[in-house]
Regions:
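Structured beta-strand/loop patches that form or line metal/cofactor-binding pockets in enzymes
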Residues: 1-43, 52, 322, 326
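Conserved, mostly hydrophobic/aromatic
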Residues: 3, 44, 68, 107, ...
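Metal- or metallocofactor-binding catalytic centers and their adjacent structured scaffolds
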Residues: 6, 40-118
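Active-site and channel-lining beta-strand-loop segments
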Residues: 35-47, 332-334, 340-343
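Hydrophobic faces of well-ordered beta-strands that scaffold small-molecule active sites
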Residues: 47, 137-140, 163-167, 187-191, ...
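Shared catalytic-loop signature of beta/alpha-barrel
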Residues: 66, 205, 211, 219-339, ...
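Metal-dependent enolase-superfamily TIM-barrel catalytic cores that perform enediolate-based chemistry
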Residues: 125-235
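Extended hydrophobic packing segments that form well-structured cores
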Residues: 348-362
Length: 362
């Protein structure tokens, strides 16, 4: 089966997070931009992927169509790992992180979806043995900066069936509100790289009091694995990291430096499904659990479920807790009894209805 065409489709989806106005990269943040990748084959099969977008969507879209697609059109797709390696080698001079890898990731996911459909098998069956099809989920909250809203959103998440919550707060009163709203259930904290080593260490007693399941990316830069390794020992709190890392190579550095308790690869950033599959294997061989970063609503979310099915160690699936105008997969809007179930269809498992999404195309 050969690749006939590759197209990047950008959707701008209004959302509601239930809080105050948010400024993101200098603008009011009112919509999410999704870069959806459509691959068509010579057998008439369509595969769907997702590349990281947000405010970088224009650059990623150009990279998909002008850098990645020309290297793949007409190629046989029986050996996707080989194609992935060819892409990475051909494009490495443009960087091994960021726009280039986001573009590769989206296309690679679409290739696996198409291949799975051609073979009438879900992606996880093309890669290995399924170990699980039901995954614990957590509600990943917006950064609100308001203790009252945070406590309310935590309680709302629990009412919706989630049994674990992640905050994106940095102020003590906001973190305390999250713990109050979550009760004794698991609470994670993603700070998005705001602090120095000294600032993080100064918060040790407070953070320990919060009984965090993990502390995520406390320091800048996120690739300062030497500092993370020190904090992992000194804080006595599990450290998680990885949403800002790309390729198996960078995760090997992270793990070999004993920087983390949990790794958090993002399938729409790291290089796609096979790259993340290699990361999972390496992490689990080194007794590190994978807690995938998946604050996404499109094919990237389903790709994560396909990979989670192959994990031998326990995991959590992240769900960005906000309402978008039109769900890609309505059955996955909320966790059922705190869990998500792996879809059973070929490829990614299910297809979205593009007719319902097309009005958001830009």
């Amino acid at each position: 089966m050969k690749i006939k065409s590759i197209k990047a489709i950008t959707l701008s989806m209004p959302f509601n997070h239930g809080g105050k106005k948010v400024i993101f990269h200098g603008k009011e943040w009112k919509s999410l931009e999704f870069n959806i990748v459509k691959v068509e084959t010579d057998k008439g099969i369509t595969g769907w992927g997702e590349a990281f977008g947000y405010t970088s969507w224009k650059s990623v879209k150009i990279a998909i169509e002008d850098m990645v697609a020309p290297l793949l059109i007409g190629k046989d797709m029986a050996d996707i790992p080989k194609l992935l390696l060819t892409l990475q080698k051909s494009l490495h001079l443009f960087g091994r992180y960021g726009i280039t890898m986001f573009a590769i990731s989206g296309v690679e996911i679409a290739l696996w979806d198409a291949l799975g459909k051609e073979k009438n098998k879900p992606i996880h069956e093309l890669l290995g043995k399924k170990n699980n099809d039901l995954f614990k989920a957590y509600s990943s909250l917006f950064r609100y900066g308001d203790p009252k809203i945070i406590e309310q959103k935590c309680k709302q998440s629990l009412d919706d069936g989630y049994q674990a919550i992640k905050l994106h707060e940095i102020e003590n009163d906001c973190i305390e509100a999250g713990r109050e709203g979550t009760g004794n259930l698991p609470l994670m904290l993603d700070t998005n790289c705001p602090w120095t080593y000294e600032e993080t260490l100064s918060k040790k007693e407070f953070l320990k009091k919060m009984k965090l399941t993990w502390l995520e990316e406390p320091v800048y830069p996120p690739e300062d694995y030497e500092t993370l390794a020190k904090l992992k020992k000194e804080l006595e709190i599990p450290i998680a990291c990885g949403e800002n890392a790309c390729t198996e190579f960078e995760f090997k550095l992270m793990i070999n430096q004993e920087a983390v308790s949990y790794v958090q690869p993002s399938v729409i950033k790291v290089g796609g499904i096979y790259e993340m599959f290699k990361i999972i294997k390496f992490a689990e061989t080194n007794n590190i659990s994978v807690m995938p970063h998946t604050a996404y609503f499109g094919p990237g979310f389903l790709a994560t479920l396909q990979l989670a099915a192959l994990m031998q160690r326990d995991t959590y699936i992240e769900r960005f807790y906000l309402d978008i105008d039109q769900e890609f997969y309505p059955n996955f809007k909320k966790a059922i009894n705190g869990k998500f179930k792996l879809p059973s269809g070929p490829g990614l498992g299910i297809d979205f209805d593009y007719n319902k999404l097309s009005k958001y195309e830009i």
